[in-house]
Amino acid sequence: MTQQLPILSLKKIYSGKVRDLYEIDDKRMLMVTSDRLSAFDVILDDPIPRKGEILTQISNFWFNKLAHIMPNHFTGDSVYDVLPKEEADLIRDRAVVCKRLNPIKIESIVRGYLTGSGLKDYKQTGTICGLKLPEGLVEASKLPEAIFTPSSKEEVGNHDINISYAECEKLIGADLAAQVKEKAIALYTVAAEYALTKGIIICDTKFEFGLDENGTLTLMDEVLTPDSSRFWSVDTYQAGTNPPSFDKQFVRDWLENSGWNKQAPAPKVPENIIQKTVDKYQEALDLLTK
């Protein structure tokens, strides 16, 4: 599957790091998940075969499983309702028909464990996004409770920046910030409890929310995939280590050790790293959904 996925009968209205959006009408759009991979906010040249299909299956699983917590972007339409059969056949496993929503202008990140940028902030200040944490935590420590740590939503190619909850309130308003925080933590908590029963620890994740035409907060984009989350295996988890993950952390770790300056273009990722990444995505899907 190539990185570009032309949908000839619909107008493309947006191309993101991984997803392309096509206009259906003023209420609906088609979201197509490509095999593109981004790391450190740079889109890599090498696609990950079948990644888009696996991500779509994982997302759809979670959207359905978490539907009791809040509305989501599903319209109930099939790709066959909006595309000619020959086009729908090509992208049916990597596309969904979704509502056109007004996106909330923050990244809604929930952390249950300490790692990544959160660990760096903690080591420097003892806090993440202004939240004071207990002393003595180490890499991969389980936090006393899940925390909401928003970041700014930057344009493609720019790095998102961790912000405090007060800054989040300034950006989107206090009422909406409170709703987003409550729902994000509720979604993470239910998902993390379920994933544990399947042998997966959800270390942290990023949710995307939007408002519908009535101002209703709605879950959108992707949910709890290896692209938006860090998944660890219960079997290999140990506090004080950097646990191996089911996600693009494989590629991120390779890039971290490659000497790359994290500016585009990224170096070519070896074939064996790409294959290991595909295998990890597939393993996550199999564990969660079987």
From Swiss-Prot:
Q: Which Enzyme Commission number(s) are listed?
A: 6.3.2.6
Q: Residue span of the signal peptide, if any?
A: none
- Keyword tRNA processing assigned: no
- Which EC class does it fall in? ligase
Its annotated pathway?
A: Purine metabolism; IMP biosynthesis via de novo pathway; 5-amino-1-(5-phospho-D-ribosyl)imidazole-4-carboxamide from 5-amino-1-(5-phospho-D-ribosyl)imidazole-4-carboxylate: step 1/2
Q: Which InterPro entries match?
A: SAICAR_synt/ADE2_N, SAICAR_synth, SAICAR_synthetase_CS
Q: Which GO terms describe its biological process?
A: 'de novo' IMP biosynthetic process
Q: Which GO terms describe its molecular function?
A: ATP binding; phosphoribosylaminoimidazolesuccinocarboxamide synthase activity
Catalysed reaction per UniProt? 5-amino-1-(5-phospho-D-ribosyl)imidazole-4-carboxylate + L-aspartate + ATP = (2S)-2-[5-amino-1-(5-phospho-beta-D-ribosyl)imidazole-4-carboxamido]succinate + ADP + phosphate + 2 H(+)
Would you say which domain of life the source belongs to? Bacteria
Q: Which family does it belong to?
A: Belongs to the SAICAR synthetase family.
- Write the protein's name: Phosphoribosylaminoimidazole-succinocarboxamide synthase
Query: In which organism is this protein found?
Result: Haemophilus influenzae (strain ATCC 51907 / DSM 11121 / KW20 / Rd)
